[in-house]
A protein has these predicted regions:
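C-terminal beta-signal and adjacent terminal beta-strands/loops
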Residues: 445-447, 812-815, 857-870, 894-944
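Short acidic/polar hinge/loop motifs at secondary-structure boundaries
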Residues: 122-151
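N-terminal Sec signal peptide and the immediately downstream disordered periplasmic leader
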Residues: 1-82, 198, 202-204, 241, ...
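C-terminal beta-signal and terminal closure region of outer-membrane beta-barrel proteins
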Residues: 439, 447, 623, 636, ...
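Extracytoplasmic beta-strand/coil segments of soluble accessory domains associated
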Residues: 50, 78-123
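Short loop/turn motifs that connect adjacent beta-strands in outer-membrane beta-barrel proteins
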Residues: 33-35, 50, 174-177, 190, ...
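N-terminal periplasmic accessory domains that precede
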Residues: 74-77, 103-106, 135-137, 161-182, ...
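Surface-exposed, low-complexity loop segments enriched in small/polar and acidic residues
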Residues: 224, 230-239, 280-321, 325, ...
């Protein structure tokens, strides 16, 4: 390429900014060329300021650092940063329907919808229906130059959704040469393995005026089941402390004891029923008493006939991904360059769930059932029963399986260049589309199952009782015992249902920038402005038979919106070359947006950068950001869901309250028809209900500010220290009132005539909750604050280079107010599982001649499994109230041959650090902990 002088400066700036090989300081990077050494700042701004700095805190991760461990997907590496939560990592992506295989980012654990993900500062199509959540695994890791993680509201500069911050992937502009790499890894104590293969090639053409490149990437991993590892194969359950002193509130005398080899005895694969005591079926269908042992709590027990639910759970999903990327640019003349990018990504993930089950609503079995063993018939006759209710997992019908296939394509076409000596422009058009196919296998047709279970004997042959069903092909099923389900019965009851989603994004935009707009005594004014039009579309289709199957019905929904935006940013040098004020700059930014859904919205930002001397700089920002409701929140149809609740009308729960609160709740429970002695055995039961969108939603608004400093002492060359305090507050946060909150709000009101009670349905006879309806509302408030510390030190050692870096986050506050008007009612999550008060990554690299050594240690502070509010209500809920301090280390060594070949061998989780006691590492919070164990990996790469 043949850039003019201004372009050369910009390219030089970009190259140096991404030159370091570790997670770099949020403040500065030392970079060297043959003639001089200078400090370079990554700005988190659209204004290029070579040799200057900006007030926004930015953490930079180089592309090489992303590939340093055995991670085969970008998301795996990024989710280990202290600033990011593990809300949707690959390990826990299957916990929601339709999300298996996704890896989306969540800055500050304030919601994936509030983190804006960009590629080269531009929007990227979503991978999740109804949202703007970007699957970062679709980004080609081979071409990543660096990743900028920007803290705080950045809507004024980058647009809506940047409420908690921005993650901006900067790709290599010109790709030259061949880069081939293959990685293979396997776990130490299981058959789990991963692999990755990438090939990239780029070349200049037309005497350097153009560049063309392509990249192909494959990544895959095996399924890892809980039963595949000794530590996670054991079932843990909290049981009542039988030795607790009456009325004890002593944490050393807890209510519950986390107990291994424990679980429910009232359900299993063979079938369980309660008739003059709990009984289960032998494999042949005969019956026996359930052995509950001596440690019993409701329908749970230990060292007994408990059922291990972990036989159905996975630690890692089966996953494959194929990426094809193409890019090209051509210098049309000295001041104009055309560029084009295209990508296609196909990812496939398989999530294994529990079989269809019947617990709260048992299967009704009649006395004359064709498969009923004579021993049970005799017992029913003795007790005068015509039918019984059987609780079971229908394991004979197979585990429910969800195969998710995503196809993502994205195209970018643009012109950029220079007008005169000082003005730089970039105009672009983007189209992106994601197609999702969700195939649900072993999906029970509930009506067919009911017909098949209700069988009778006719002329010595088992047939379905219902004549119409029999004529339609009904095949009777024997659910008693194990191994008795025929293939014909399975085929009649199960179906394969397929749901599809299509997400589309269209963007037209342009920016114009002048880093030297006007010269002031203190320096040049920098200016950037732009316009953008964006259209988002999403459509989700359910299969025709979804309504009558066991899989959750998500509901069909579709919607679209567009937004027109104009924005501007200016950097004004105020003072320079004064005592204690080497440079003082003011940054201002504003954006006006017109949405087809919510109407007008304005965001802004102000920042101050104060360079005291060559060694010390202070910085601060204050901003207002918004997040417009996404398509799913606006137009999501009411779909089937399941809510985990503990009914507040239970006598045990009422007895834990103050007399005044108990009196109000008892009166409302009675008014709802709940018996006064109601005390369901099913604590934390899963209640069926509906959840969906609300087209009356408005935008969320946030205010955030940061205050920080950067210190680069002259007396320790290569050392850079930055510390930033950040504070984020979100009002009118879009939230569905939790099912538990809805129950409590219903019962704590003066009467049952309120919006919460109207959304809850109870059985008129038993008083049990049978259904809950939840919709999104602008009802919540979120706030978080913390301190980020970033220390980088580069130095020489024994004729080699050492690059060390410490990235640390101290979380001071993370509060959620379910109802923003009730400021005294909130949950504190700082220090809660997944949101440790202290988190840190320490990396060190040593390179000498052709050798390279890498080390990383991650630290997660002790976390609580209960919020302070929960412990205030009950200070001794369990003997397992926290996970201890967690250290995990990775190491690798590499050797580069003169012919371009490089070999690398590494071990992740070098010391085989176990998971915290009782967890599987697949929850939204516990996914921070490694569930694979010690993992060996090797990489062969070749560059020329």
């Amino acid at each position: 390429m043949q850039p003019n002088s201004i372009l050369a400066k910009a390219v030089r700036f970009a190259l140096i900014s991404g030159a370091a090989t570790a997670a770099l300081s949020a403040s500065a990077v030392y970079a060297a060329d043959e003639d001089s050494v200078e400090r370079i700042q990554v700005t988190g701004s659209r204004i290029i300021r070579e040799g200057a700095v900006a007030p926004t805190p930015v953490t930079v991760i180089s592309g090489e650092e992303l590939l340093a461990t055995g991670a085969t997907n970008i998301g795996e590496a990024l989710n280990q940063l202290p600033a990011l939560g593990n809300t949707y990592s690959l390990a826990n992506s299957g916990r929601s329907i339709g999300t298996a295989g996704l890896n989306v980012l969540d800055l500050r654990n304030m919601g994936t919808a509030r983190t804006l993900v960009l590629v080269d500062g531009k929007r990227h199509v979503s991978s999740s229906a109804g949202s703007q959540r970007v699957d970062v695994n679709t980004i080609p890791s081979t071409w990543v130059e660096r990743v900028e993680v920007i803290t705080g509201g950045a809507s004024a500069i980058y647009g809506a959704d940047a409420v908690t911050g921005v993650v901006n992937f900067i790709l290599k502009e010109d790709v030259e040469g061949l880069d081939f790499s293959v990685t293979k890894g396997f776990a130490d104590d299981s058959s789990h393995s991963k692999e990755k293969l990438s090939l990239s090639y780029g070349t200049d053409f037309d005497n350097g005026n153009g560049n063309v490149a392509f990249a192909i990437e494959y990544a895959g991993q095996d399924r890892l089941r809980s039963l595949d590892r000794d530590q996670t194969a054991i079932s843990f359950t909290e049981l009542r402390n039988q030795n607790q002193q009456p009325g004890s509130v002593d944490p050393n005398d807890p209510d519950k004891i986390l107990t291994p080899n424990a679980g429910y005895y009232a359900i299993n694969n063979a079938g369980v029923f309660n008739l003059d005591g709990w009984k289960t079926f032998n494999p042949d269908g005969s019956i026996r008493d359930v052995y509950t042992g001596s440690n019993v709590d409701g329908v749970k027990c230990a060292d007994c006939d408990s059922f291990n639910l972990r036989q159905f759970s996975d630690l890692q999903p089966e996953f494959e991904r194929y990426n094809i990327n193409f890019k090209s640019n051509y210098q049309l003349n000295e001041d104009m360059q055309a560029y084009f990018e295209a990508k296609y990504v196909n990812s496939q993930s398989t999530d294994y769930g529990q079989p269809a089950f019947f617990f709260g609503s048992p299967v009704t079995v009649k006395r004359d059932n064709a498969f009923l063993h004579s021993s049970l018939q005799d017992l029913m006759d003795e007790k005068g029963k015509d039918s019984i209710g059987v609780r079971l997992f229908t394991n004979g019908l197979g585990q429910r399986i969800e195969d998710d296939t995503r196809e993502t394509q994205r195209y970018v076409l643009g012109l950029k260049g220079y007008i005169g000596e000082d003005w730089e422009y970039d105009t672009y058009a983007i189209y992106g589309q994601t197609d999702l196919e969700r195939v649900n296998k072993n999906n029970m047709i509930k009506k067919n199952f009911a017909n098949a279970v209700d069988s009778i004997m006719v002329n010595g042959v088992a047939v379905c009782r219902d004549l119409e069903a029999r004529e339609a092909g009904c095949v009777p099923i024997n659910i008693f015992g194990e191994g008795n389900v025929t293939t014909d019965a399975r085929d009649y009851i199960n179906t394969v249902s397929t749901g599809t989603s299509v997400i589309k994004q269209t963007v037209l935009g342009g920016t114009i920038t002048n880093s030297m707009l006007y010269e002031l005594p203190a320096g040049d004014i920098g200016f950037s402005s732009g316009v953008e039009y964006r259209k988002e579309e999403s459509r989700q289709n359910e299969p025709d038979n979804a309504e009558g199957t066991f899989f959750n019905v998500l509901g069909e929904d579709s919607g679209e919106y567009d937004v027109k935006e104009v924005f501007a940013e200016v950097n004004i040098p105020l003072l320079a070359d004064l005592p204690a004020i080497q440079q003082l700059d003011l940054e201002l930014a504003a954006r006006y947006a017109d949405y087809s859904t919510i109407g007008d919205a304005t965001t802004w930002k102000a920042g101050l950068s104060w360079q005291l001397n060559d060694e010390l700089r202070a910085r601060s920002t204050y901003s207002r950001a918004i997040r417009a409701p996404n398509i799913g929140e606006l137009y999501g149809a009411l779909g089937q869901n399941f809510f985990n609740v503990d009914d507040s009308c239970k006598l045990d729960n009422l007895n834990d309250l103050t007399p005044e609160q108990a009196a109000v709740r008892k009166a409302n429970c009675a008014a709802l028809g709940v018996p006064s002695d109601f005390n369901s055995d099913y604590d934390s039961a899963s209640i069926e209900g509906l959840s969906g969108g609300n087209d009356q939603l408005k935008e969320e608004t946030s205010t955030s500010y940061t205050i920080g400093a950067i210190y680069q002492p002259d007396f320790i060359y290569g050392l850079s220290i930055s510390a930033d305090y950040w504070n984020i507050e979100i009002d009118d946060a879009i939230s569905s009132v939790s099912a538990q909150n809805m129950i409590d709000k219903c019962l704590d009101s003066s009467t049952i005539d309120n919006i919460y009670c109207k959304r809850i349905t109870r059985d008129p006879n038993s008083g049990e909750i049978t259904s809950i309806v939840s919709q999104s509302l602008n009802i919540a408030k979120l706030e978080a604050a913390g301190v980020d510390l970033d220390i980088g030190y580069v130095f020489d050692l024994y004729n080699g280079d050492v690059n060390t870096n410490l990235v640390l986050t101290h979380l001071l506050k993370r509060n959620e107010y379910p109802f923003q008007g009730e400021t005294d009612t909130y949950n504190e999550y700082a220090g809660y599982v997944g949101e440790a008060e202290w988190q840190a990554n320490l990396t060190a690299q040593y390179s000498k001649d052709n050798w390279g050594v890498y080390w990383r240690t991650r630290f997660i502070d002790e976390v609580s499994l209960y919020t302070p509010q929960e412990l205030e209500k009950n200070p001794n809920p369990s003997n397992n109230t926290s996970y201890g301090k967690y250290f995990i280390s990775d190491a690798s060594v590499s050797y580069s041959f003169e012919n371009g070949i490089k070999l690398k061998f590494g071990v992740d989780n070098l010391f085989d650090r176990d998971l915290p006691y009782g967890t599987t590492g697949t929850g939204a919070g516990s996914a921070s902990y490694d569930n694979v164990g010690r993992y060996y990996h090797a990489t062969f790469s070749f560059m020329m």
